[in-house]
From Swiss-Prot:
Renumbered residue ranges of the record's region Disordered: 134-158
Residues at the active site: D193
EC number assigned by the record: 3.6.-.-, 2.7.11.1
Gene: BUD32
The keyword Transmembrane helix is assigned to this record: no
Official protein name in the record: EKC/KEOPS complex subunit BUD32
Ranges where the Protein kinase domain occurs: 8-289
Protein task: Component of the EKC/KEOPS complex that is required for the formation of a threonylcarbamoyl group on adenosine at position 37 (t(6)A37) in tRNAs that read codons beginning with adenine. The complex is probably involved in the transfer of the threonylcarbamoyl moiety of threonylcarbamoyl-AMP (TC-AMP) to the N6 group of A37. BUD32 has ATPase activity in the context of the EKC/KEOPS complex and likely plays a supporting role to the catalytic subunit KAE1. The EKC/KEOPS complex also promotes both telomere uncapping and telomere elongation.
Molecular function GO terms recorded: ATP binding; hydrolase activity; protein serine kinase activity; protein serine/threonine kinase activity
């Protein structure tokens, strides 16, 4: 039996897709309890830390040897990408468990709201079905949703209200996102699935600021080699804004502005050129179907 099996059995399934299942646990291991001799009372030594377990389950349509190799490679790169990002100052979940054989990676559970929720895109479902995605640089596979949904604006989300109470505007939030993405791309890592659902806002009482942006779900991350790799990453986020958050052009412009400032003109220029090319290809695909 794999070491991760008991952990998965204790978890609650919160997301399911073609590549992986995600479970939530109140803690990685049962909370230790200390007993005092001569006393009937006891207390826990430490508060439990909620965790997330992502299980890349076996794909029966692949040869077992190939499946095991791909699962191990993707799991290892995800863990290393998170470590590199954290070292570079990008706020990401802490990795607390890696079981390559079972295809399981464990991370701290981020308490807060997704940027999607804050901007009024709605909360993700309790169990979300995700379309299978492969790690490819081809923009046509990364920017699938071309329709812009025109939806009426609803009431302010709980997260947005909390930020407003701290004096934080949507513009401040966009700048924070741009700065976080610049730090990530400086490490030569691309996220691979940049959406507002994969960005969390966590309040930080007593910290250097009232909140922080936490980038999550690095399952499709990869090593960047060319400016176009970064441009595709940005374009995926641009399309996510357009499809989930109507009339958000100014907000995304704020993300790009701060991103460019964080990278510096020398690094930003070639990415900017490629981003324009990627947009043109995306528009052409929309028109031709």
């Amino acid at each position: 039996m794999a070491a991760s099996t008991p952990l998965l059995s204790r978890g609650t399934l919160i997301k399911q897709g073609a590549e992986a299942k995600v479970y939530a646990l109140p803690s990685l291991f049962p909370e230790p309890t200390t007993y005092h001799p001569g006393s009937s009372s006891s207390f826990s030594a430490a508060s439990p830390t909620p965790v997330i377990l992502k299980h890349r389950f076996t794909k029966t349509y692949r040869h077992p040897t190939l499946d095991a190799s791909l699962t191990s490679q993707r799991l290892t790169f995800e863990a290393r990408a998170l470590a590199r990002a954290a070292k570079a100052g990008v706020t990401v979940p802490k990795v607390v468990w890696v079981d390559e054989k079972a295809g399981v990676i464990g991370m701290e559970r981020i308490e807060g709201w997704s940027v999607r929720e804050i901007l009024g895109g709605g909360a993700e479902g309790e169990v979300e079905v995700i379309e299978e995605q492969e790690i490819e640089e081809d923009v046509e596979n990364k920017a699938e949703d071309s329709a812009v949904r025109e939806e009426p604006e609803g009431p302010e989300s709980e997260g947005l209200k909390a930020l407003k109470n701290l004096g934080v505007t949507q513009e401040h939030l966009m700048r924070s996102i741009g700065a976080a993405l610049a730090r990530l791309h400086k490490t030569m890592i691309i996220h691979g699935d940049l959406t507002t659902s994969n960005m969390m806002v966590r309040l930080t009482p007593g910290g250097s600021g009232p909140y922080e942006i936490v980038l999550i779900d690095f399952g499709l991350s990869s090593q960047a080699q060319f400016p176009e790799n970064y441009a595709v990453d940005l374009y995926v986020l641009e399309r996510a804004f357009a499809s989930t958050h109507p009339r958000s052009e100014k907000l995304y412009a704020g993300v790009l502005e701060t991103y460019a400032e964080g990278l510096g003109e020398k690094k930003w220029k070639p990415i900017q050129i490629k981003l324009k090319d990627v947009r043109r290809r995306g528009r052409k695909r929309d028109m031709t179907g």
